[in-house]
């Protein structure tokens, strides 16, 4: 089955919805989720999803968020204040971003993704996701123009989700 990552995240979710809105996919890899009413992204929501992934056998190590949600995560009150002692001869550095999140179930790298929807935060275990080759890399001759030989590099790849329960998502975020 070929589908987007969101069509494979069903078990470990936090969503804001009813039986009509905010619904997880019904058939993995085929259907996708239905959006619910947006709500604020909180540390409680993130902790809930991480705990669900861990309880389902995953060891999450990455949190993929939009740039907007990256700023929200950096502002979670549970993150310790970071300070550097500034040498008298140097410039001061203001730290206001977070790149790692230490949870009760391990450390997650916070990865900003400019192509991801702002309403989704994905908690992933990279051990259970991979690239699958539908057609391996190949080089084809395409055209000769004068002395130049032109070639094409061609491949077909897709995402392979090896265990849906090793991943999770916080959805319907504002």
What are these regions (language model features)?
Residues 53-56:
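A short acidic-Thr-Gly-centered motif at the start of a beta-strand
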Residues 60-65:
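Hydrophobic beta-strand segments of well-ordered beta-sheets in folded domains
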């Amino acid at each position: 089955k070929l589908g987007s990552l969101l069509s494979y995240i069903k078990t470990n979710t936090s969503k804001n919805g009813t039986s009509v809105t905010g619904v997880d996919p019904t058939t993995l890899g085929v259907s996708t989720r239905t959006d619910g009413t947006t709500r604020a992204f909180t540390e409680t929501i993130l902790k809930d999803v991480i705990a669900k992934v861990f309880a389902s056998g995953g060891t999450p190590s990455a949190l993929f968020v939009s740039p907007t949600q990256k700023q929200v995560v950096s502002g979670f009150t549970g993150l310790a204040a970071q300070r550097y002692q500034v040498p008298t001869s140097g410039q001061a550095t203001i730290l206001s971003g977070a790149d790692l999140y230490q949870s009760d179930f391990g450390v997650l790298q916070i990865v900003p993704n400019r192509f991801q929807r702002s309403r989704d935060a994905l908690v992933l275990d990279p051990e259970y996701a991979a690239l699958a080759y539908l057609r391996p890399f190949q080089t084809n001759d395409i055209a000769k123009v004068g002395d130049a030989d032109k070639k094409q590099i061609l491949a077909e790849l897709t995402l392979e989700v090896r265990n849906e329960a090793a991943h999770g998502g916080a959805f319907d975020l504002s």
